[in-house]
Amino acid sequence: MHVKENLLTESIPFHKKGLLLHVVSVEYLDNYQLKLTFNNGIGGIVDLEKELYGEMFEPLKDKSLFQKVFVTSRTIEWPNGADFAPEFLFEI
């Protein structure tokens, strides 16, 4: 998974407020696109097609599995255990 180098520094202001960024809702849209809402009230659409590589993420290229995404306590996850850090999702 490619993570932007400035990810941590960009998320610090939110952490300074005593809050940890997390996903509160997810909706499957089409292909590998998801509509996400975060606990800071910001939402948007992420396209994860280019992020589906590696042992945990390759199975998600099967759209029937990708569509089974759900929200955990902080982020999104799939039945095979694959997940993305909420900070990463917020930045893409």
What is each stretch, according to the model?
Residues M1-I92:
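Motif-centric detector for short Cys/His coordination patterns
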